[in-house]
Amino acid sequence: MSTKKHTKTHSTYAFESNTNSVAASQMRNALNKLADSSKLDDAARAKFENELDSFFTLFRRYLVEKSSRTTLEWDKIKSPNPDEVVKYEIISQQPENVSNLSKLAVLKLNGGLGTSMGCVGPKSVIEVREGNTFLDLSVRQIEYLNRQYDSDVPLLLMNSFNTDKDTEHLIKKYSANRIRIRSFNQSRFPRVYKDSLLPVPTEYDSPLDAWYPPGHGDLFESLHVSGELDALIAQGREILFVSNGDNLGATVDLKILNHMIETGAEYIMELTDKTRADVKGGTLISYDGQVRLLEVAQVPKEHIDEFKNIRKFTNFNTNNLWINLKAVKRLIESSNLEMEIIPNQKTITRDGHEINVLQLETACGAAIRHFDGAHGVVVPRSRFLPVKTCSDLLLVKSDLFRLEHGSLKLDPSRFGPNPLIKLGSHFKKVSGFNARIPHIPKIVELDHLTITGNVFLGKDVTLRGTVIIVCSDGHKIDIPNGSILENVVVTGNLQILEH
């Protein structure tokens, strides 16, 4: 982004330039030692060295950007032009062209672990609905699409080193299904000590917590390096539909596919209207005549409240992205695919001490500014159904949705937005959630639910309107079988004894 720089003295610039030069040189030496530590065959070593080179490019850029302390010129941020954000209702009037499916491939981002929900292994293997995992639902959707239209849309999974082995093992069970599944690994970059700016790993086999997958902005490079990009283009695939593996609303949409082909756009980002729950979501802006993604991390502190104003920034990025594959190849080969760096601070434990480390990440939504004709499409909220917490899990397991060929369809009798559900720390892990809510309550008429403390729900419970259940420390609340709770607050202690 064209940005405003804070003025500095020449001596400050000279000092920072020298410091950056030393940091870059020390990093390069450390990475060379890291490469020499590997006892790999030639092909694997070349791949490892290529990853370290990519990381070094990112690290050097981080040093430059950090010392220039560039900030957005807030006054230059404009709402997107009408041609930069199109409403789904307009494009959905166009007829569908099923033959366009021969040009499509689908990719699910599958690098995340289920640790935030208390699960071991890839997040995609958490059971979501009627015995189906995230991965099962993705496979069922594409398989049904291929059967319905007699097409051959392939499914790609971008794994990380955290999920790759488990995923490779799991996808074998789909070998008899009508679907081609390919998986490849995204990069493995070294974490960096925050104080010394040196890499945490000292050898190829350093512990897992010394490394990190560098965000989904790494998608383009990893597609290219793995050979999958060229393979897709050779098959006549032109467009890649990318989405988060945990977004159950991200199904193939023929209307958006047709719109992309007819307009010749190289990149389409699906946006949806913000609610008060989405105030931190990245949004599309017009900046210096370019369409760009503005993330909350890029917003100056004094403008955060303005950024969260849902009247000024009305929609946000769902991370459902439609991307032209030949454009990706062109931009990678000309090294024109820089994305804003997101420095992510973490802590790791060494010798019983917590140590601050940095991981430098990028997001694929930020690449939008490099593609010709790139624009946003404002889609219905139904295309954004992420499962980040057990509160989300309750929603997607409920009678609010029914499962059709791997897709979740909203109950037509439901009126208004999805209910707002907030479950307390007792429900943070899937195991705790399943133990406390073994039978999902009926919530078609629910607006808001808050449950905190030692609470257990019985069978055939119905929740309507606003329901708040708060159990004090040291107590327990059992909601009896068959209860109907409507616009109530339940507090204190309620135990049902078996007779």
From Swiss-Prot:
- The PTM Phosphothreonine maps to T19
Q: Which residues bind Mg(2+)?
A: K123, D246
InterPro entries in the cross-refs: Nucleotide-diphossugar_trans, UDPGP_fam, UDPGP_trans
Quick check: keyword Phosphoprotein in the entry? Answer: yes
List of residues that carry N-acetylserine: S2
Record: residues binding substrate: G111, G112, H216, N244, G245, D246
Q: What is its EC number?
A: 2.7.7.9
Tell me where in this chain the PTM Omega-N-methylarginine is found: R369
Q: What does this protein do?
A: Plays a central role as a glucosyl donor in cellular metabolic pathways.
The entry's family comment says:
Belongs to the UDPGP type 1 family.
The entry's protein name is UTP--glucose-1-phosphate uridylyltransferase
